[in-house]
Amino acid sequence: MEIQRITHLPPQILDLEKAAVAGGFRFLTRLTSEWQSGTHCFDAPGECLMAAYLNQQLVGIGGLSVDPFTHDRTGRLRRVYVAPASRGQQVGRRLVNALLAHAALHFERVRLYTDTLEGSAFYLRCGFNRIEDAHASHIVRITKR
């Protein structure tokens, strides 16, 4: 498996989006819409979009942005999704670890919001802690390397 920082949406994003929508998730639709309109391209300082490839197939995607709900050195994980057929193979964990490694260069903490039990359990396994906040469900403090 290979994790790459990407600066354009690969054509395979449409297949990943279709799988996400079938699973009840619309955030990849929002990712493609915001990317195409230029509203959010993960190109501000400290931001990035990463893709996970397995046998040259896009199997996961995730972004890191500046957290718009804070005014300090806080990043936000956004649009993290792994294709159902690739779950349980450490794709999500490796993708999140790559995003957090990038975050360590720019942020002191990273927050995210998930409203699913599966997502919450996944992020807890990745080292995040639950928080009570109107705009975030989990946080992790970054240790500088």
Listing of model-derived features with the role each one plays in the protein:
Residues M1-S37:
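Short amphipathic alpha-helix that is part of the acyltransferase structural core
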Residues A51, Q57-V66, R76, Y81:
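Conserved beta-strand in the GNAT
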Residues T39-A51, R76:
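A short helix-loop-beta-strand connector motif used in the catalytic cores of GNAT acetyltransferases and
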Residues A103-D115:
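Conserved GNAT acetyl-CoA-binding A-motif
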Residues A85-S86, Q90-A98:
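Conserved acetyl-CoA pyrophosphate-binding loop and the N-cap/start of the following alpha-helix
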Residues V66-P68, H138:
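A short acidic/small-residue loop/turn micro-motif
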Residues R111-Y113, L124, N129-K144:
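Conserved catalytic-core motifs of GNAT/GCN5-like acyltransferases
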